Design a protein with these regions (language model features):
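Short beta-strand segments
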Residues: 40-44, 69, 104-105, 131-134, ...
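Glycine-rich N-terminal segment of FAD-binding domains in flavoprotein oxidoreductases
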Residues: 28-58
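N-terminal glycine-/serine-/threonine-rich phosphate-binding loop
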Residues: 1-39
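Ligand-binding beta-strand-loop-alpha-helix segment within the catalytic cores
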Residues: 1-3, 62-131
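ATP/nucleoside-binding phosphotransfer catalytic cores, i.e., glycine-rich phosphate-binding loops
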Residues: 188-191, 195-250
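Class I SAM-dependent methyltransferase SAM-binding "motif I" and its flanking Rossmann-like core
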Residues: 141-188
Length: 250
């Protein structure tokens, strides 16, 4: 669709392994040209199959990868299991010898200072590759439709989360009730994500089918922030058959 390549798999495990294989190929190609690869990761259960395969990899030189994560709740305790930094630490960052990992500080008192600090880290050199999902409301990172912008200058900012996004965190089993889910977060912006040379988007389950259809079949618009993937020069979307169920009949 437009410039976006799409692959559909019979199972989410097959989807995750295929995404890992392309990720490995991209990283090795990047490493042939540069010393350090700068990689952004999403913290979500949609990424579990991909991250499991990546954590079991024996071919990538992780000592040449600097890691970032794309969003973080504000106001949760620093040790909360739902914190995205903790999620990724457990899933991948502590399991491989990264050159460096840059965490968004979820307990930052001065939000603007934390945004300035993390933006400085992001802009030290070009961003190379991002692995991400799509939310039930079509968001990428925490760029929900009501606040998403394709043209903002900042690469990270504070955002308020819409209730569809917050309910998704309950649906994923991360929180017991909607009221437990934080209402604000820090998120990398769409221009930051789109600046990456390579984009790998991994979207399993039927709960995402409507968002996938909007992403691929609707207009490129902030009403469905993920639709911007169709404008990237090197983006690949990996779906399982449940996530693709509304587009396979088109």
């Amino acid at each position: 669709v437009d410039t976006l390549t799409i692959h559909v798999y019979n199972s989410r495990q097959d989807m995750g392994i295929a995404a890992y294989e392309l990720y490995k190929k991209h990283v090795r190609e990047l490493m042939a040209r540069q010393k350090i690869v700068r990689a952004i990761f999403a913290a979500a259960h949609s990424q579990d199959d991909f991250l499991k395969a990546l954590a079991e990899d024996t071919e990538i030189d992780f000592t040449r990868i600097t890691g970032f994560h794309m969003d973080e709740y504000m106001g949760l305790g620093k040790d909360a299991s739902q914190n995205f930094g903790n999620f990724l630490r457990k899933a991948i960052f502590s399991r491989k010898p990264f050159h460096e990992v840059n965490y968004i500080q979820s307990d930052a008192i001065d939000i603007s200072a934390e945004c300035k600090r993390y933006e400085g880290l992001l802009r030290q050199a070009p961003l190379d590759i991002v692995s991400m999902g799509i939310g039930e409301n079509g968001h990428i990172a925490f760029n929900d439709p009501h606040e998403a912008r394709f043209d903002e200058e900042a690469w990270i900012r504070q955002t308020s989360l819409d209730n569809i996004c917050r309910q998704q965190q309950v649906n994923d089993g991360e929180f017991g009730t909607l009221s437990d889910v934080p209402e604000t977060a820090l998120t990398l912006t769409i221009p930051a994500l789109m600046s990456c040379k390579k984009v790998i988007c991994i979207v399993p389950t039927g709960r995402k089918a409507q968002a996938v259809r909007q992403t691929l079949c609707g207009p490129v618009s902030v009403a469905c922030p993920a639709s911007v993937l169709r404008t990237h020069s090197d983006a690949t979307l990996f779906l399982d058959k449940e996530a693709a169920e509304l587009i396979l009949t088109i």
